[in-house]
Structure formats: structure tokens, C-alpha cells
From Swiss-Prot:
Protein name, UniProt field: Multidrug resistance protein MdtA
Compartments it resides in: Cell inner membrane
Organism: Yersinia pseudotuberculosis serotype IB (strain PB1/+)
Segments of this protein annotated with the region Disordered: 37-60, 399-444
GO cellular component terms attached to this protein's record: efflux pump complex; plasma membrane
Primary localization class, coarse: membrane
Length: 444
């Protein structure tokens, strides 16, 4: 009986201890958290009061870069893909048969019209010339003898010593000999021409390509294999295409140029469209549109004195068709695309931003023409746009120089100033903790 009473007493003690612990924990959590919350609330209230008095003055303004819209003369260009072609291309072949004796050019060199390029063995044609000259001498002697006989027959015919038939026969012999002499002269001229053809000269000025036949080979006239190909690159042409919708602008540019006896300028740019290679002028326009692509071909001519353009080279051709006067121009970075269309952020005298919808015109990688929505002299934001909202005040800063950007200490100092002198990560607050302004109460 006593043992059971002891067990019951111990159970009550254990339960009491557990209940006391639970009550203590609940009391601590309730009263301790409330105290902390009250303290935090008081601190936040104090900070709020301090902020209402002077915190706004310490909030940093968003830094932006700005530019002023200006009025300029802006040329209007049409750009098309083009290929460089030689102004003239000649495939040099032999017009006579024979062994190739010599080549008188270096592959890739510039030659002038009339320069000796190659020689075919001339000996067979020299022999033919000698034979033709010998036959001419023989027939010429026969002709001379026939003419003397004809003169005698004419005298005898007057005295009646020979018949008229004999006189006519002699006259025919003279004419026959004259024909033989003319044929011989033709044979001589042909032999001389063949001998001339054995010396192959450049028909045009230009650049020779790689040789196609080596010395020692037997060449026949009319063969498909040329000796060399010459391309005229001074000047050189560029054939490019433009959409058919651009034809009116091109034709108007041509008419304007004809009125002033000027040319329509054309520029050739490299494959990446970053470097201008040469300047030329519009030479001609094709007389029909390609129905497959809906484009028209144009040809431009370039002097190419510095040999920057090579046949079959790919280029971007830019043709100037107009010059806009007093066009409002801003940097391309200032124009943004939104759901309502293109817009820019403008700045007033107090550096407050305002969103303006604009209509853009001609543009490139550096600047864009504003057709409507902006006036010359207005300032527009070019950098820092992602932090802007309507009516917010900003700080206009100038771009740092390359020297400043490459100096780590200067860059860190500038970043700290732009963030309102907030501490560097790891020097007073965790990396993910938000920055806050220093209040007057905390300073005191």
C-alpha cells in the first residue's frame, strides 16, 4: 500500500514539473517577443520620424546620362547586297596552232593593252611567208611578161599582122596574171598575220590571273583551255539589288542628278558593314524586275585605284538618294520600344523625366532621326533608362573616362557615391541586406 502511494506521488511531481516547464516556455515566448516587437516598433517609429524630417534629402537620385536633340542634314541611303565584277574580262587564247615557246607575264601582275604575254613557235609561219613571197615574185614576173606581149600585140593589131582573137587572148592572159599576183599578195598578208598571231599580246589593260598552260605544250586555236584570263579592275563595277519599292526613290535621285549634271553617289562597304571600302557612282539600272525575288539590279562604278575591290568580292552597296534638311537627331540609345511604340525619356530644367512617344525615321548604329514627337534642343536620356518612372527626378552625370574605369579604387569610390555612400558588401552589412539612409538620430 505504501509502495503504491509513493508511485502516485512521484507521478504527480513529474506532471507538475512538465506543466511548469510548458508554462515557462509559453510565458517567455509571449512576453519576450512582445518586448522585442515593442522595441523594434519604437526604433522604426523613431527612424520614421527622422526620415520625415531629413531622410528624403539623403536618398540618392538615380544617375543617368543625357544628350540634346539637334538639327542636322542627314543623307538617306538605300543598302543592298552586291558583288564586285570586272569592268571587262578577257579569256586569252591562241589564234594559231603551235608550241608555246615563252610566257612573258607574272601571275597576278597588272598589264597594259599591247603588252606581250606569250609566244607561239613562229617558224612554220615564217616558212609560209617566204613561200608566199616567192610565189608572188614568180607570178609578178609572168604578169610583167604578159603585159609586154600585150603591148606588142596591140601595135601589130593596128597594122593587121595579128588577128583580134590573138589580141583578146593576150589581154586575158594579162588579167589572169594580175589575179595570180593579187592572190599571192593575199597569201603574203595571211602569212604575216599568222606570224603576228604567234606573238600573243594583252587585248585590254588589267590584272592577269593564274596561268592555265605551261611552256612547251602544243596549243591549237579554238581550244577551250585559255592561256590566262585578264580582268580589268581600273575601274571596277559592283552589281547589287534593291527591292522594287525603292525604284521611285532611285529614279528621282537620277533625275535630280541629271538636272545639276551631278552623279548619284554609291559607297561600297565590307561584308560586316563596318568599314567603307570605296566611293563611286551609279552607272546604270536594269530594265526589268526579277519576278522571283521582287528586286531590281543596279550597277555602280568605282575607280578602285587602291585595288581594295576584287572581282567576285561580296560587298554592301549604299546608294545616296536624298538629303534630309533640318532633321531632328538623337543617339540611337535614347529610343526605346514599348507596347505603345517607340518612345524617349525627356528631361526638364529640374531634371525630371517624362515619357514621349516618337516616330522614328532614318537610323544607324549611332543616331536616329525623329520624324515626330520631339523638338531640337530637348534633352533625352541615353543611359540609366531601366530605373526611370514618370516624373521622377534624376541626376545627370557625364560618362567616366577610360582611365577612371580602369582604376579599381576610383570605380569603387564612384559606385559608393552613386549609391549614397552605402557601405561596401562585407564591410558593415551582409551582401543581401538592403541599404538604408543614415538618419539624424543615428548620427547623434
Amino acid at each position: 500500500m505504501k509502495s503504491q502511494s509513493k508511485r502516485t506521488s512521484r507521478l504527480f511531481v513529474f506532471v507538475g514539473v512538465v506543466v511548469a516547464i510548458i508554462i515557462a516556455v509559453l510565458s517567455w515566448r509571449y512576453f519576450g517577443t512582445g518586448s522585442d516587437n515593442n522595441t523594434s516598433g519604437a526604433q522604426q517609429s523613431a527612424r520614421g520620424q527622422d526620415t520625415s524630417h531629413g531622410g528624403r534629402r539623403n536618398t540618392p537620385l538615380a544617375p543617368v546620362q543625357a544628350a540634346t536633340a539637334t538639327e542636322q542634314e542627314v543623307p538617306r541611303y538605300l543598302t543592298g547586297l552586291g558583288t564586285v565584277i570586272a569592268a571587262n574580262t578577257v579569256t586569252v587564247t591562241s589564234r594559231v596552232d603551235g608550241e608555246l615557246m615563252a610566257l612573258h607575264f607574272t601571275e597576278g601582275q597588272q598589264v597594259k593593252a599591247g603588252d606581250l604575254l606569250a609566244e607561239i613557235d613562229p617558224r612554220p609561219y615564217e616558212v609560209q611567208l617566204t613561200q608566199a613571197q616567192g610565189q608572188l615574185a614568180k607570178d609578178q614576173a609572168t604578169l610583167d611578161n604578159a603585159r609586154r606581149d600585150l603591148a606588142r600585140y596591140q601595135k601589130l593589131s593596128k597594122t593587121g599582122l595579128i588577128s583580134q582573137q590573138e589580141l583578146d587572148t593576150q589581154s586575158s592572159l594579162v588579167r589572169q596574171s594580175e589575179g595570180s599576183v593579187k592572190a599571192d599578195q593575199g597569201a603574203i598578208d595571211s602569212a604575216k598575220l599568222q606570224l603576228t598571231y604567234s606573238r600573243i599580246t594583252a587585248p585590254i589593260s588589267g590584272r592577269v590571273g593564274l596561268k592555265q598552260v605551261d611552256v612547251g605544250n602544243y596549243i591549237t586555236s579554238g581550244t577551250a583551255t585559255p592561256i590566262v584570263v585578264i580582268t580589268q579592275t581600273h575601274p571596277v563595277d559592283v552589281v547589287f539589288t534593291l527591292p522594287e519599292s525603292d525604284i521611285p526613290a532611285i529614279m528621282q535621285a537620277q533625275k535630280n542628278a541629271e538636272k545639276t549634271h551631278a552623279i548619284v553617289p554609291v559607297e561600297a562597304w565590307d561584308r560586316t558593314n563596318k568599314q567603307m571600302l570605296a566611293q563611286g557612282y551609279l552607272l546604270s539600272i536594269d530594265n526589268q524586275i526579277d519576278t522571283t525575288t521582287g528586286t531590281i539590279k543596279l550597277k555602280a562604278r568605282f575607280n578602285n585605284e587602291d585595288d581594295v575591290l576584287f572581282p567576285n568580292q561580296f560587298v554592301n552597296a549604299r546608294i545616296k538618294v536624298d538629303l534630309l534638311q533640318n532633321a531632328v537627331v538623337v543617339p540611337t540609345a535614347a529610343v526605346q520600344m514599348g507596347s505603345e511604340g517607340n518612345f524617349v525619356w525627356t528631361l526638364d530644367d529640374a531634371n525630371r523625366v517624362s515619357k514621349h512617344l516618337v516616330t522614328t525615321g532614318i537610323q544607324d548604329s549611332q543616331q536616329v532621326v525623329i520624324d515626330a514627337g520631339l523638338n531640337a534642343g530637348q534633352r533625352v536620356v541615353t543611359d540609366g533608362i531601366d530605373r526611370l518612372t514618370e516624373g521622377v527626378q534624376v541626376e545627370v552625370v557625364t560618362p567616366r573616362s577610360a582611365n577612371t574605369d580602369t582604376n579599381p579604387a576610383s570605380a569603387e569610390k564612384a559606385a559608393a557615391e552613386a549609391e549614397g555612400s552605402t557601405p561596401h558588401q562585407g564591410r558593415g552589412r551582409p551582401a543581401n541586406a538592403p541599404a538604408r539612409s543614415t538618419t539624424a538620430a543615428e548620427k547623434s
